[in-house]
Amino acid sequence: TKAVFLTHVQGFNGLSEKLLQYLSDKDVPLIEDVCEAHGATFQDRRLGSFGLMSNFSFYYAHHMSTIEGGMVCTDDIEIDGMLRMFRSHGMSREAANPDMELKIIEDNPKLNPDFIFLFPAYNVRSTEVSAVLGLSQLKRLDENNKKRQQNHRIFLENLDGSKYKTDFNSVGSCNYA
């Protein structure tokens, strides 16, 4: 197994101690998809902070919206450099990693380092308008998630438990309700 890609669906945590221990024992990286669970937690720690990297979507129907776009988080400096280049046409100058930039210059001494395109990529840089939208919503994320949790409880209380599953483990969740 090269990696485990785990999706936290509809605001529910997909992690367990058993899974995290297994991945640690086997040295298998975890990649978290937190697109539908912004602000949700596992053991009082935010989802998206457990793995090698995580992704968040800011599509209009998710917990936070910049109308379109998303974000990838990682503590790995090499992955960070690659992602920064990938979002910006593959330009080496976007790496924001001095060691990586130096290696690129050493490997390409005859080329202007400002115009080295290392691989085919895209222009998926966010706009300042999107950033303003996202930051304004980030301030209200916890409050909005509390409302979602209250709505979820009310919804479950009004379902017929003999016909529908109503015993969800909602600790740390940030449901869509």
Feature roles, as predicted:
Residues 1-66, 71-73, 77-81:
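Active-site phosphate-binding strand-loop segment of PLP-dependent enzymes
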